[in-house]
A protein has these predicted regions:
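Structured C-terminal subdomain patch of bacterial secreted/periplasmic proteins
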Residues: 252-325
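Extracytoplasmic substrate-binding proteins
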Residues: 126-198, 290, 299-325
Length: 325
């Protein structure tokens, strides 16, 4: 596929995409003098061949943007999102908004004329459409192999810009911090992780959507894995009280997304308010100040899949375990 296509072909491609018309943009052209060198890299779809040092990169995933930011790589377009503090600079007008984390803005892409598009997670469903517009990488991760997939993503993006040494250094730091947390976690009592969406609560045991707390970071689980409920196990406050966790970890979805009202237009209840009740206070976690409200954006929006998000999340849990001994 051409690394750059004419405005006319871009318009045709975007029109086809917008109306669901199938068909490739065009056949790959032979290499031309002055064409950027290419490299074969790994991504979630397998192997991909892309140009070295792309400059007009559009990123539709916050964990991938985390990698780009950590390695100081060029970004031209981003998804509109609730950014964590360390990524808030991407809300600046110099970065064009190219859609949401789910839906691309094809008119914006036509203006940007990207030479690389990056999708993952929420945006991965648009891979086939976007790949007709520009070379596209899918940097989705599997929670059960999070560090391995994070390593692949860092290696892939670093290799495009000759920053392999920085990528290796970054991942060595991530792996070292994770191992340090696992050593602390081995000495700690089991914990219960829950996701709160307003007043709805679901436990996240090993293998669940956010089970990486146990699967990757080594926190001993209070609940066993339940393969039949990959999105989590529904719970009420009385269920948590009955389990009596020594540690209770909470992810607040609404705090991550900035949601202010529910579907009925009623104000949402912040998790810190929701969990401030006699049932939770009566648990071992409540009595011993071991209710930990995890960084909502780092966990819910980035899934700990970006190296900086992972380092922040590990540091928070380490501090909690050390303080709660």
């Amino acid at each position: 596929m051409k690394l750059m296509i004419s405005r006319r072909r871009m318009a045709l491609a975007l029109t086809a995409a917008a109306w669901g018309i199938s068909g490739a943009v065009g056949a790959a052209a032979p290499a031309q003098p002055g064409q950027p060198a290419q490299i074969s890299v790994q991504h979630a779809k397998g192997q991909a061949t892309v140009a070295l040092k792309p400059q007009r990169v559009v990123v539709y995933d916050l964990a991938a943007l985390d990698v780009m930011h950590a390695l100081q790589l060029p970004v031209a377009g981003v998804a509109k999102a609730e950014y964590p503090d360390y990524l808030k600079s991407y809300a600046d007008a110099k970065y064009q908004v190219a859609g949401s984390l789910f839906i691309p803005d094809y008119e914006a892409l036509s203006r940007i004329r990207p030479d690389l598009i990056v999708v993952a997670g929420r945006s991965a469903a648009k891979y086939d459409v976007l790949a007709k517009i520009a070379p596209t990488l899918d940097l989705s991760v599997d929670g059960k192999n999070l560090l391995g997939d994070m390593q692949r993503n860092v290696d892939t993006l670093a290799s495009l810009y000759g920053k392999q040494a920085q990528g290796r250094q970054l991942m060595a730091k991530v792996r070292g911090e994770v191992e340090g947390l696992k050593a602390l976690a081995a000495q700690a009592e089991p914990g219960l992780l829950v996701l709160a969406v307003n007043t709805s609560i679901s436990a996240q045991p090993p293998g669940a959507r956010f089970g990486l707390l146990h699967d990757v970071l080594g926190i001993k689980p209070l609940l066993a894995a339940d393969a039949s409920k990959p999105r989590g196990v529904p719970m009420k406050m009385e269920d948590i009280a009955r389990l009596d966790p020594a540690w209770l970890y909470v992810i607040d979805r609404n705090a991550a997304t900035g949601t202010q009202t529910d579907k009925q237009g009623q104000p949402v209840i912040a998790s810190k308010q929701l969990f401030d009740n006699a049932q939770i206070q009566g648990t071992r976690a409540g009595r011993n100040a071991r209710v930990v409200f995890l960084d909502p954006k780092g966990w819910y929006l980035l899934g700990s899949a970006g190296p900086t998000a992972m380092l922040h999340n590990v540091a928070q849990i380490k501090a909690a375990l050390q303080a709660g001994k």
